[in-house]
């Protein structure tokens, strides 16, 4: 049997995820298994996707990249948009990412200043590897003249 707070957490989690509030309350292990099984896809529809965050920085002087300016994040996004044809999305007037509408992938600027590839759903890890390789090839090509570099690190460096 689940502890009462576990049931509340599952219920609140469903609410936050936009689930129908008339869904039956999960009160037992069997209820939980049944709910999870309803959400499963057939194996033929299984996909894998990439989430790849990297810090963006300049080397001279060593510092994070500002949003504005001729060598900033906005310029990086504009250059990648031009190379890929992906569509920008905005926070107010400011582009904060690009969407690839053909395959449901994109690039976004994260709150800590990281640059993130949210990959398209792929049939296997080889597809994600190819997608990441192409993303980095384009990003580096656009970034090089801007003196922008990338660092895949799980914590923010001390600049």
Regions found by a protein language model. Name each.
Residues 13-159:
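Terminal catalytic/cofactor-binding subdomain
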């Amino acid at each position: 049997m689940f502890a009462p707070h576990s049931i509340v957490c599952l219920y609140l989690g469903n609410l936050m995820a936009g689930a129908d509030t008339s869904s039956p309350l999960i009160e037992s292990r069997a209820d939980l298994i049944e709910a999870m099984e309803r959400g499963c896809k057939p194996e033929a529809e299984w996909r894998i996707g990439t989430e790849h965050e990297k810090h963006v920085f300049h080397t001279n002087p060593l510092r994070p990249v500002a949003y504005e300016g001729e060598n900033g994040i906005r310029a990086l996004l504009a250059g990648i948009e031009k190379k890929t044809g992906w569509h920008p999305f905005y926070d107010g007037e400011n582009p904060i990412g690009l969407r690839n509408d053909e395959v449901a992938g994109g690039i976004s600027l994260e709150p800590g200043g990281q640059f993130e590839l949210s990959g398209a759903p792929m049939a296997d890890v080889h597809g994600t590897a190819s997608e990441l390789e192409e993303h980095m090839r384009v990003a580096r090509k656009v970034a090089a003249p801007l003196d922008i570099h990338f660092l895949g690190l799980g914590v923010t460096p001390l600049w």
